[in-house]
């Protein structure tokens, strides 16, 4: 259960209302997701987070689908169900296929498993990797 009730989009004012409008336009959505409505209790945090997300998630050396898949991978590893679902949705909207998502999940699984094995066995890093 949330700590703070998400801000009602229709009751948003000032900077929050402006950012909500930009989020909807940029993400091509009609309703503000609960994440944004929840952090809107702290308008400077809302603004900073939105600006950072826009800057980082835009196309660059990595395309938008790849960035969304990375976001999903990190969210799975961090056990953030909300972020996993919302960014899987975003990845699909940007062109990710079910097969791409399945393969990414396989990579997350094997990476997490092998990371834990390396730590458990205290494997020394090979000279070639240093």
Where are these regions (language model features)?
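Hydrophobic alpha-helical segments
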Residues: 1-130
């Amino acid at each position: 259960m949330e700590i703070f009730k998400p801000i009602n989009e229709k009751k948003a004012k000032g900077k929050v209302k402006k950012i909500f409008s930009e989020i909807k336009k940029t993400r091509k959505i009609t309703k503000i997701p609960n994440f944004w409505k929840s952090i809107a209790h702290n308008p400077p945090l809302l603004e900073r987070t939105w600006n950072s997300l826009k800057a980082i998630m835009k196309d660059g050396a990595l395309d938008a689908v790849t960035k969304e898949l990375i976001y999903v991978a990190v969210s799975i590893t961090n056990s953030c169900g909300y972020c996993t679902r919302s960014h899987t949705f975003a990845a699909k909207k940007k062109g990710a296929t079910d097969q791409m998502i399945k393969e990414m999940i396989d990579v997350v699984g094997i990476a997490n498993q092998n990371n834990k094995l390396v730590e458990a066995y205290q494997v020394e890093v090979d000279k070639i990797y240093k």
